């Protein structure tokens, strides 16, 4: 990470896409995409996804590391080009507990991530706990971040410290996109970014963390990008002009969250304007969902009814029977909710792919299509971009390859933004 930031600060149009997903096909897509490029790949886990108690994936930080390393080994991707990051590390999961208890767990969370070899750590103590006022005083946020930083510094060995980097900042959109309809989005004021840096510098120095300050590589801000279930707010460089100018005077860059679904030109403009770390998550699993839905349509054309996976019906049954991951986010009427379940840009389906029934139906879908030849006309009908790549000879038409390539469509847009020599 330090090398990428140094090159950016030296004037290169270089950034990095942060892949925020625990889906094995998404991780495989990212690693295969850069297998021969020489580029680093940044894969991040969030605190509610992966923590010392297992998170909603059931994985502790060391488990997630081994999970990613296992996929890297299968792909042949060298570990030294992998960067593991932890996102929203702090009291996020324990906001309903008193601050003292939540911070105690947060310290253990940080230690678990650092011990497991995660080198990019987002110190996020912005959320109010059960006995806190709302919102928290910025100095309280910074002092709590310093407590977390101290835990990381004391846990890391000398080799880990060479690679250890921190991201600070609190102004992040709702993880995974907005839950409600958006019309506009508030761009962080440069005075607020400056205050974030200043309060963290004071708090770190109070705690004797002067050396750790040199490891702070980025501040999280809102450059004016967002999405909800049906809309995307695209980057408007002029609205973030003052914010973009301010960071030039520091040794840091910005990290932008919820950059999913922006145009490739927007990614290039974001990196040019020093939002050099671009986080993406739902757009990747949305592409995965599109690929599986497309393959299901092909299956309906090629496989006899009694042999079909029924994957789309199984998804509906599971999500309607177990609505916990989508009910409070999607629209209330039946017809609207079904559209959201299938096609919402916030892609709440992503929480259901590990479900045993859905996983088995996807496996059957792929097995069924592996046993037949996929007609080019059918691929053109349901996956036209992949059809073009087949015609160019850069893709072979297996179900697995089609899924991987569909996910990589998203990564191609990020590469255009993050790599100076990509046309």
From Swiss-Prot:
Spans through the membrane: none
rRNA-binding among keywords: no
Pathway where it operates: Carbohydrate metabolism; D-tagatose 6-phosphate degradation; D-glyceraldehyde 3-phosphate and glycerone phosphate from D-tagatose 6-phosphate: step 2/2
UniProt keyword annotations, A-Z: Galactitol metabolism
Top-level taxon of origin: Bacteria
Pfam families: GatZ_KbaZ-like
GO annotations of cellular component type: plasma membrane
Single biological process term from Gene Ontology: D-tagatose 6-phosphate catabolic process
Keyword Transferase found: no
Protein function: Component of the tagatose-1,6-bisphosphate aldolase GatYZ that is required for full activity and stability of the Y subunit. Could have a chaperone-like function for the proper and stable folding of GatY. When expressed alone, GatZ does not show any aldolase activity. Is involved in the catabolism of galactitol.
Alphabetized PANTHER family for the sequence: D-TAGATOSE-1,6-BISPHOSPHATE ALDOLASE SUBUNIT GATZ, N-ACETYLGALACTOSAMINE PERMEASE II COMPONENT-RELATED
Annotated HAMAP family: Tagatose_aldol_GatZ
SUBUNIT field: Forms a complex with GatY.
Family: Belongs to the GatZ/KbaZ family. GatZ subfamily.
Protein name: D-tagatose-1,6-bisphosphate aldolase subunit GatZ
Gene: gatZ
